[in-house]
Amino acid sequence: MSRQKNQNSKGHGVSKGKEREQRTLIRFKTTLMNTLMDVLRHRPGWVEVKDEGEWDFYWCDVSWLRENFDHTYMDEHVRISHFRNHYELTRKNYMVKNLKRFRKYLERESGKTEAAKCDFFPKTFEMPCEYHLFVEEFRKNPGITWIMKPVARSQGKGIFLFRRLKDIMDWRKGTSGKKPTGVETQPARANMNPSGSHDTRSSDDQKDDLPVENYVAQRYVENPYLIGGRKFDLRVYVLVMSYIPLRAWLYRDGFARFSNTRFTLNSIDDHYVHLTNVAVQKTSPDYHLKKGCKWMLQRFRQYLASKHGPKAVETLFSDMDNIFIKSLQSVQKVIISDKHCFELYGYDILIDQDLKPWLLEVNASPSLTASSQEDYELKTCLLEDTLHVVDMEARLTGKEKRVGGFDLMWNDGPVSREDGPSDLSGMGNFVTNTHLGCVNDRKEQLRQLFRSLQAQRKAPS
């Protein structure tokens, strides 16, 4: 169970090793009323609790995390759905800072070729603090399109495109010296102080120090890959169970989100052309759910294979694997590692005409609200398999490379599809254990997995 640290509770009267085995019910808590609640309520042996401090598993929102995590004691078996400073990866400005820092580290330690593997995000500047650097870059490349994004908002809120320096100057003048209004709370970065503990000041401590809402100015990808003349991006799910060591799973299913209007650079003010967020697209006057604003990743992969051949598709998806791993490695040393925490990230990836993937952002709270029956089924399976990997029931051995729709892609090093030790000396025949957009026969895999685990438990030692 969890409890406030000042309650001086001693815990249960059995050893921690046996405590987990003896639990007959998993007590869960969540405030999210969407697909997640359906999955939790229908999971065998799980029961919902309302009281604070009486849960074994809490799928919380990030606001609860900021206010309560540091004051909550958790028993060995307790799990919670976010890392303390998840925003090092999921806030747009922190993500870019960490990726830039990691790229410099790789260049220094491994050379330019290895560092170039981090060149998967568009040139980005934090505003307003890097305004002068941005202006310098802007003047080097006049006429290109830029996109402004608030660092802590989602669902396309506050985003605009521009090509003239006057537009950004007007924006800067319009916000300079004003307190932000309607802005999400800015989480404090967790810094290591000389004593070795983390500085976890609340976001409210820093809010008044911010004269304006922070944005990033990012070079807009002007040559996106189009299907049916429409722009799209990909939503991919990555589950991180640990940062030290890094242990990450990639889900086989995901989807492509299409804009509702044919792509053109002649109307940069039209969000229905340039923003693929469902929250934006569903406000379009001619939006129809059955029109096809989402494709499952398996369909998308098959489409690309028919157009470009299997080899080009393998290269593209391998490049996306690189994005997932390098982005996680970029924050591995700054994320506060905690055995109670896991995180289901939603990656947003854009593909350009050259089949190069670009990382747009990473979401700590990817939408779990279904927009269609197909979307509901995907998210239900995703969440069921997330709970299988988290393994509150203690059924897994820890050696599994696949659980349902999740494939273990990194376990303190790359994971091979083949069984046995990995020979990474030349990487000649090494194939990463990822199957994004491939067949997801999760039900049959889970049936075989749990049957095998049950047989192992019954076998004489």
From Swiss-Prot:
Site keyed Essential for specifying alpha-elongation versus initiation step of the polyglutamylase activity: positions: Q155
Disordered: annotated span: 1-20, 172-208
Gene3D superfamilies per record: ATP-grasp fold, A domain, ATP-grasp fold, B domain
Main location: cytoplasm
Biased composition (Polar residues): 1-10
Domain of life where this protein originates: Eukaryota
Binding sites annotated in the UniProt record for a protein: Q155
Binding site for L-glutamate: R257, K294, K379
EC number: 6.3.2.-
Binding residues annotated for Mg(2+) 2, in chain numbering: E361, N363
Keyword Metal-binding belongs to the record: yes
Any one of the GO CC terms: cytoplasm
Similarity comment: Belongs to the tubulin--tyrosine ligase family.
The protein, known as: Probable tubulin polyglutamylase TTLL9
Lineage of the organism: Eukaryota, Metazoa, Chordata, Craniata, Vertebrata
